Design a protein with these regions (language model features):
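Signature of the SF2 helicase/ATPase Hel1-core->accessory helical subdomain module
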Residues: 191, 291-308, 313-343
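Conserved pre-motif I regulatory segment
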Residues: 138-180
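Mg2+/Mn2+-dependent nuclease catalytic core
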Residues: 26-121, 191
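A substrate-engagement module of RecA-like helicase motors
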Residues: 142-146, 150, 202-309, 317
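Walker A/P-loop NTP-binding motif
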Residues: 168-169, 188-202, 221-224
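Acidic-basic catalytic patches of nuclease active cores, encompassing PD-(D/E)XK
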Residues: 1-28
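Walker A/P-loop
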Residues: 172-194
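Polybasic (Lys/Arg-rich)
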Residues: 114-147
Length: 343
């Protein structure tokens, strides 16, 4: 952010027509639902009454030879949703990579007409809508199967039926429940089964634990449920230092071949993992290596579309490592193993 601010101050000094941090937003229809797209343009310049320039700044120690797809997509969307006034005939989009130590800049730019921006933006929305429609079809099928989802064992263990019933009541009513049960009483499946039964269309289950054994129990329970409901999807989140190929090899992320150009290859990898139903660490690594993408980032992207996410407590409760993409807690059910450890 500091580097970006330095560039913005310099540009404001050099060009009186330059302005920084312009907010943009546009309401769009996705699968019949209205969604609000929001963003902030790093730099904006009216070059003439007919031409404007939109700039996006990225800090990196590894200047790319070509513009990165995801970065260019961002500035392209800004160009498409930035309102045009008067007789604007073209928009110059500029993507600027800045070295944080030397401030050396690598620039990529292209000029588009309003019609070209509109057409490209429509294609982006169409691609996202296809993914969203596929997701909704799976959710609909999942919900149909869940209506008749039986407990995965022939009978409950002692007190397990009452445990599951109490969990279901709490989840449906939005109640916070602290449940104590002895080891070996089947807490994992006793919590996960009613949570799946209570799942609504846009909700997600987070099974949080501080222990490997707790994660293993949660994944085993989810697989038992998936055997009864093939539309359920589960993702296991592993700490970056244990998941990333480059982290384990001691490489800087900036130079990691699995991170560079990640979004150019991630969609097919995410689709493959979702088709498996259960994306545990070993499967994530296998698919990530096949598609040459970062396994940690792949697990996060897959979790965005999954029903059950198994991960460490810190991903929700530690402000330093909490995942920003999962901050809308109203849509999540939290099942916390060893909850007393939070105190």
């Amino acid at each position: 952010i500091k580097i970006q601010q330095l560039v913005q101050k310099r540009m404001e000094t050099q060009d009186p027509n330059y302005s920084a941090e312009q907010s943009v937003q546009l309401e769009v229809s996705i699968c019949g639902d209205l969604q609000m797209l929001r963003g902030r343009i790093d730099g904006f310049v009216n070059l003439s009454p007919n031409i404007r320039r939109i700039e996006e700044y990225k800090t990196t120690r590894s200047a790319p030879d070509i513009r990165r797809g995801a970065d260019w997509g961002q500035v392209f969307i800004y160009g498409a949703i930035k309102p045009s006034f008067g007789s604007i005939q073209s928009t110059e989009l500029e993507l600027v990579y800045i070295h944080p130590d030397t401030l050396q800049e690598t620039r990529f730019s292209s000029v588009y007409t309003p019609a070209q921006l509109d057409l490209g933006f429509a294609l982006i929305l169409l691609l996202y809508e296809v993914r969203e429609e596929r997701h909704r079809e799976r959710i609909s099928y999942r919900d149909q199967l869940t209506e008749n989802l039986d407990f995965p064992f022939a009978e409950f263990r002692p007190a397990q039926r009452n445990m599951a019933a109490r969990n279901y009541k709490a989840l449906v009513s939005g109640e916070h429940l602290l449940l104590e049960a002895p080891t070996g009483s089947g807490k994992s499946i006793g919590a996960l089964y009613p949570a799946v039964k209570a799942l609504k269309e846009d909700e997600k289950i987070f099974f949080l634990t501080a222990r490997n054994s707790g994660a293993e129990a949660a994944i085993k329970a989810s697989m038992l449920l998936q055997a009864k409901n093939s539309a359920l999807t589960t993702v296991e989140l592993t700490a970056r230092r244990k998941a990333c190929f480059c982290e384990r090899a001691g490489e800087e992320k900036t130079f990691c071949p699995f991170s560079r150009g990640y979004y150019d290859r991630s969609m097919s990898a995410t689709n493959e993992l979702l088709s498996l139903g259960s994306a545990v660490k070993s499967e994530i690594e296998k698919v990530a290596e096949k598609h040459s993408v970062c396994p940690f980032e792949l697990s996060l992207d897959t979790a965005t579309w999954a029903d059950i996410v198994v991960g460490d407590l810190n991903y929700v409760f530690d402000p330093y490592v909490a995942l920003k993409r999962f901050q809308d807690r109203e849509r999540f059910m939290l099942l916390i193993d060893e909850a007393h450890q939070l105190a």
